[in-house]
Curated annotation (Swiss-Prot):
Signal peptide: none annotated. Belongs to the UPF0149 family. HAMAP family: UPF0149. Pfam families: UPF0149. This is UPF0149 protein YPO0911/y3298/YP_3608.
Amino acid sequence: MSIENTLPTYPSLALALSQQAVALTPAEMHGLISGMLCGGSKDNGWQTLVHDLTNEGVAFPQALSLPLQQLHEATQEALENEGFMFQLLIPEGEDVTVFDRADALSGWVNHFLLGLGMLQPKLAQVKDEVGEAIDDLRNIAQLGYDEDEDQEELAQSLEEVVEYVRVAAILCHIEFTQQKPTAPEMHKPTLH
């Protein structure tokens, strides 16, 4: 199955957000929407929540609502794809420094946790592998770096962290959106 919807480009979404004076980066917005989807958001209530969290409850004009709808649909489709097609929307390219990518990743993770926590308010009680992944995400959200570090080494480490975050998000999506099997009902025989 191929992904029919594609994510808006980072620069085009950055422009749409800045034109509407929304103080989030595309990475942060994608993290927020991804967190809500991974937390179990199934309906159009995500838009109201995004408006409340980012725009004082005011709906966005069509110039921003359409790219955000596209972002939501492509992200949802990627998360639900069994081929693990989900990717983080963080800046890429020759003109993007490793420090810019690290900052974007930190913002993505912070907003992912916000979106996830809005739909799963008892995150601190989640155990096992998913609980560990959430704890790791909290640590990654506070990601720091030394600008004197070897940028090539930092870039390699960053790619590993991005991959870990991607897998952790998929793990959360599986945990919070898929129906858990329930024990079969025990029917007592009827005595006549």
